[in-house]
Amino acid sequence: MLRTNNPALREDVFRKPETWDSFQAAQRGGAVAVGPAARPGVMTLQGAVNASFILLGLCAATAIAGWMFIQNNTAMVLPVTFGGAIAGMVLALIISFRPRTAPFLAPVYAIGEGAFVAGISMVYATYAQGTNLGGATGTGIIFQAALLTFGILGALLLAYTTRLIKPSENFKLGVAAATGGIFFVFIAQLVLNLVFGITIPYIWSSGPIGIAFAGFVVVIAALNLVLDFDFIEQGAENELPRHMEWYAAFGLLVTLVWLYVSIL
């Protein structure tokens, strides 16, 4: 995926790569010592940021519209939730194996995820209203989860850009391994539930083990944001093809939705 050209044969070998530091300086209007402009057709940090805002906007707008639709059509909560989830999974698989489709399919994926977010949010809100938490808490937990998600995003982005967090190879390996382990647990739970009608004990309960596992999932989901930031920066430095801007934005949206649902 990364360029493998011999750097000694490249005319722009000494061009300063685009990084978060230079990007922030440019946003503040400061002078940045850079060489020739990025060649057309390659990934840039600004392009990835723009694509991320577009996908996030589409997802948020669809989620809000979906929430309003479900409120007036409560019987549609499950069709909207499962429809968005299935569409999202199918599109995610296509984009993952065919990154060149990202500029076209990532916006559609964002819309599908927005529908899923609306549906799953309504499910959690309805559950909260039926408990001793009280009816007003139903919509309150949705707002709090969204606020926490964007708060974590902002905090980790600040920590990354100021280099308080430096994703070393061991860090990346550890986060990837933990993510794979969580994915395996989710798949195992799905199979056990569908085939035998049972659940994995303790980790899905409201007891200490269940709460600890839920907290662990939130932490790993949040740390995946750091890997997304690193991928965007490394992609710009290595001048990946332009369509990787949308692929990187797609990956960031996947992590954000996972983080939001985990917080719920």
Name these PLM-found stretches.
Residues 1-264:
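A hydrophobic alpha-helical transmembrane-helix feature that marks the membrane cores
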